[in-house]
Amino acid sequence: MAAVESRVCETEGCSSEAKLQCPTCIKLGIQGSYFCSQECFKGSWATHKLLHKKAKDDKIKPEVSPWTMDGEVNTDPWPGYRYTGKLRPHYPLTPMRPVPSYIQRPDYADHPLGMSESEQTLKGTSQIKTLSPEDIEGMRVVCRLAREVLGVAAMMVKSGITTEEIDHAVHLACISRNCYPSPLNYYNFPKSCCTSVNEVICHGIPDRRPLQDGDIVNVDITVYRDGYHGDLNETFYVGDVDEGAKRLVETTYECLMQAIDEVKPGVRYRELGNIIQKHAQANGFSIVRSYCGHGIHKLFHTAPNVPHYGKNKAVGVMKPGHVFTIEPMICEGGWQDETWPDGWTAITRDGKRSAQFEHTLLVTETGCEILTCRLEENGRPYFIS
């Protein structure tokens, strides 16, 4: 702590002379923050550290609101932020797109914080819902529609197209199918799909950066209709990509399909991570540990928790009627991740590329049904066909 002129200690109930100031507050430009001793400073830490968070949040807020378009000038939203790779956000973003009132909306759609109260009610529970025949049919319908919407996005992917344009097409495709785009306002996520380019692991926010030849981009689609969510994603090549990108994308898809091959009643959810890790590591890649697959039906995210790395401690055994996603995120370098200051965009800490594929699955009496399977090309993903 730095020495400063005499002040009164700011710890509640202490009136001693204070000559020490919090060094983090000095760095962040926070006025005050004087303490008489290390003991008083430590005793106030629980509440004092909130000042640091607020100051940091205020510092990264762009002068121009990121949710409004102001000409074509690209604004750096986070001056001083140290990016791990070459990708940069292209701000400001366009406003959050409206959804017609006649389309059924999930409970978080109009919540000021985008909070799903139905999910919060079940937060922390490991109980896995067994879907009724009616529920299963609802999931089949919505997953088929989600697949159609991903097909629209797939046709958009090429050099020069922005992820913002892909998001716009996805939004319109959802509306035309009487679906709500599930990501929109989910805990205030500002767009209708996630687009994750190169070193972005997941939850990338579509913006005005044009895709470039050699990029890889994951488009993650979830749609909501008649009370159910359907979720899937694929990673696409943009133009001609190098052999490293091809090997990463191919291995990631193989990890997903090898895990799916093991889905059947009686299998522990924790086993899927062992299968994925074995194949990824055999090819020299690592597995992201911070994000995982999840149960899905009337709730966007719920039990079970489905980690993609080995020796995990996931709870639960597969039973007929369970519906969940597997969505491995595989990295060229290390598995460690960071998050951009937007609070969403997860990126590799070493700046190397990451790829992902996802399906929503139904456990049947004898195995599983891939609810989001592509109907064309014998179910093969777009990077193959």
From Swiss-Prot:
Amino acids binding a protein: 203, 301
Cofactor: Zn(2+); Co(2+); Mn(2+); Fe(2+)
Main EC class the enzyme belongs to: hydrolase
Cited PROSITE patterns: MAP_1, ZF_C6H2
Gene3D superfamilies membership: Creatinase/methionine aminopeptidase superfamily
Localisation per UniProt entry: Cytoplasm
Enzyme Commission (EC) number: 3.4.11.18
One GO CC annotation: cytosol
Chief localisation class: cytoplasm
Residues engaged in binding Zn(2+) 3: 220, 231, 358
Residues that span the membrane, as ranges: none
Annotated function: Cotranslationally removes the N-terminal methionine from nascent proteins. The N-terminal methionine is often cleaved when the second residue in the primary sequence is small and uncharged (Met-Ala-, Cys, Gly, Pro, Ser, Thr, or Val).
Name of the protein in its database record: Methionine aminopeptidase 1
